[in-house]
């Protein structure tokens, strides 16, 4: 691991390097965060460390939908008021949360935890497509689904992922739909307002 120069404590440099794993945080930003925590908010730094350790220890993936949960099966999958025959496929738990905030969707989810990206060696296995297929078709897991809504992002990789999944599911006779184009091309659900997402879900088109 990279160490600091003369006079730089190794523990500080390790903290800076650790903060750089956050998206959008470069060396300068990580350094500012580290110095702020140590200089102005040591209590906050301790709370952050404890919360991170607790989350890393207790949060794992739902055995049905693959989202984050502290139980074997998440609350959404266990909710009897949800329509288990309709499945919405999203890239991340953050995307799932955005759709939930629209209050327009009452089905269940499957979270890919990514999208197809051959250049990054991310293929069908890495985004759990075997598990998705089982969830959509196996009666023991809530299948067969009456409809699968593809809510991957409208990026080139998200579109390619939606196409791949759509062909896979249609070959099994499952109805597949895609979010309407209210979501901007190149846009990610995490950064789109709830009203736009709600309209995209309601106006979804069959593939």
UniProtKB/Swiss-Prot annotation:
* GO BP field: DNA recombination; DNA repair
What domain of life? Answer: Bacteria
Name any one GO molecular function: zinc ion binding
Q: Which cysteines are joined by disulfide bonds?
A: none
User: What keywords sit in the KW lines?
Assistant: DNA damage, DNA recombination, DNA repair, Metal-binding, Zinc, Zinc-finger
Residue spans, zinc finger C4-type = 62-77
Instruction: Tell me where in this chain the Toprim domain is found.
Output: 85-184
**SUPFAM superfamilies (UniProt xref):** Recombination protein RecR
Q: Which InterPro entries match?
A: DNA_Rcmb_RecR, Rcmb_RecR, Rcmb_RecR_Znf, TOPRIM_dom, TOPRIM_RecR
Chain ranges passing through the membrane: none
What is this protein for, i.e. what is its function?
Answer: May play a role in DNA repair. It seems to be involved in an RecBC-independent recombinational process of DNA repair. It may act with RecF and RecO.
Please report which protein family the annotation says this sequence is part of: Belongs to the RecR family.
Q: Write down what this protein is called.
A: Recombination protein RecR
